[in-house]
Design a protein with these regions (language model features):
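Carbohydrate-associated surface elements
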Residues: 101
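N-terminal glycine/serine-rich phosphate-binding loop of ATP-dependent small-molecule kinases
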Residues: 1-94, 122, 222-232, 424-426, ...
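Short acidic-aromatic active-site loops that bind/stabilize oxyanions
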Residues: 47-55, 126, 130, 207, ...
């Protein structure tokens, strides 16, 4: 067979990545990774994504990969919930808001005055955070803005970039599932919720399946880049769902933990899981591909480390990720933890060390002074949250688990990987630092007819890539068990 070559772009909240994937019929090669910056823009007290810088970076990567071969296709996945509004002529109506923009600071509480949190979960299977599309759209209603009346089309970020590349407007189902706006079965929009909140629906498109060709890259773009046209594919637009689709031999009874700016962790299911226990545990449902869904929780992870780096730079001290791992390894375990879901810790700006100490003081814990202790506190808090969520799946939702797979860029943090293994008191399999790109590439091969199912995608991933196994240190089990018990009593882990 002729070797297939595809280009994958993955936009994360902290940065973008691209790769070229080559498939010869038996093994997949993914390489020539190209990283680029995703730097938000603050303007007049609002926070925006630099959409056109991201788009230009994708074009640069496309040129790079087209120098020595003709690519068959390209696809883009992104973080969830971010959207763009277009007018009837296909023009953007406003800049693309960052999900941490403060215009939604009070939108959740006001939204729940109209429709209860429980009702939203019953209708959608989702428990939106402030960063989700639902509260962002409700903020227009809350502030009596007319922007939705002017909008002809709403496109989520991967669909918006697909539109830029091909001229085709579509809404792919997995990325729409990050919005908090779909029905419980994840098959269509929850029009009842739109009506209850007074959000108009004229800008919505029908949902389409991932792994579908969307036409060719526009000739104008190809000519301007001096490259051959290629197919544009809607892969699995939601970055986490894309990563899950590419985990080697993943399936029932396994937990995935995708670590980057945020953690998204959960299990794969065929039917949405609802009920009081799932609701109380903060779990949500979202679509992946075929009839597969994920039951998951998400919370901040390296966002806190990024904020720590920023705060230290403002104080005149610069730490690399390697520096932080070494400091954390050398620091004493103090058994102090923060809730990575805490709203104040997740607001942009301010000094994260001051925010952490304020949280520790409020929760009756020892405050910190040394940078190494702050770093260790952040990492241990992430590991403790993972432990809490994993035990909730097993003990409260009664989902038997026999394997833990940790994926994406966070797996490079060997200190955190060992902490997670120790906290869970079981082996964890870590790897695929570019798992989302891998899933993107595999889904393109599916769309091109080279693979026939998600199972075949995962089998190919298993034949092509290896995972590193971390084993727990038995003597540390008591530290994590007592830490979780203490934090649950204080209401820190929830």
């Amino acid at each position: 067979m002729r070797e297939k070559t595809v280009i994958a772009a993955d936009l994360g909240a902290s940065g973008g990545k691209m790769a070229k994937g080559s498939y010869n019929g038996s093994r997949l090669l993914a390489g020539d990774f190209f990283d680029f910056e995703n730097k938000p823009i603050e303007l007049n007290k609002n926070l925006y994504w630099d959409l056109f810088a991201l788009y230009n970076s994708i074009l640069q990567g496309t040129v790079r990969y087209s120098q020595d071969c003709e690519a068959d296709s390209i696809s883009v996945d992104t973080w969830g919930a971010t959207y763009g509004l277009l007018d009837s002529k296909g023009r953007l109506l406003e800049p693309i808001y960052h999900y941490r923009d403060l215009r939604t600071e009070h939108s959740m509480e006001r939204m729940y005055q109209n429709v209860s949190r429980e009702k939203v979960f019953q209708l959608t299977g989702c428990q939106p955070a402030r960063s989700y599309t639902l509260p962002q759209l409700y903020s227009y209603v809350e502030h009596q803005e007319r922007i939705l009346d002017l909008a002809d089309t709403m496109l989520f970020l991967p669909d918006l970039l697909t539109y830029f590349l091909s001229g085709e407007k579509v809404t792919e189902r997995s990325i729409a599932g990050t919005s908090g706006l779909l029905r419980l079965d994840q098959e269509d929009w929850c029009y009842e919720l739109f009506r209850m909140l007074g959000i108009q629906t004229d800008m919505l498109l029908p949902l389409t399946e991932p792994g579908t060709e969307r036409g060719m890259m526009s000739r104008r773009i190809a000519d301007s880049l001096n490259i051959k046209q290629m197919k544009v594919i809607s892969a699995i637009g939601h970055d986490t769902a894309s990563a899950v689709a590419g985990i080697p031999y993943f399936g029932v009874g396994q937990v995935y933990i995708s670590i980057g700016t945020n953690i998204n962790m959960g299990v794969e299911v065929t039917e949405s899981v609802t009920g009081e226990t799932a609701f109380r545990g903060g779990y949500k449902n979202a679509a992946v591909m075929e009839d597969r869904k994920i039951l998951y929780r998400d919370f901040a992870a390296f966002w806190l480390l990024n904020e720590f780096q920023r705060s230290c730079r403002e104080e005149g001290c610069s730490y690399s990720y390697q520096d932080m791992m070494e400091l954390a390894s050398a620091a004493k375990a103090r058994s102090v933890f923060v809730d990575t879901d805490d709203e104040i810790l997740n607001n942009a700006g301010g000094n994260i060390k001051e925010k952490i100490n304020a949280f520790l003081e409020r929760s009756g814990q020892e405050t910190l002074t040394e940078d190494a202790d702050f770093i260790r506190c952040i990492l241990e808090s992430i590991a403790l949250k993972v432990k809490y969520c994993t035990e909730y799946l097993e003990k409260e939702l009664h989902i038997p688990l026999h394997k833990i797979s940790v994926i994406n860029g966070g797996t490079r943090n060997y200190v955190l990987m060992q902490m997670i293994s120790d906290a869970l008191a079981r082996p964890v399999y870590c790897g695929l630092p570019y798992a989302t790109l891998t899933g993107n590439i595999l889904t393109q091969l599916y769309a091109l007819g080279e693979l026939g199912s998600v199972d075949e995608m995962r089998d190919l991933s298993g034949r092509s890539f290896s995972m590193k196994e971390y084993h727990p240190v038995e003597k540390r089990k008591e530290y994590w068990d007592s830490g979780l018990q203490k934090m649950m009593e204080k209401g820190v882990c929830k």
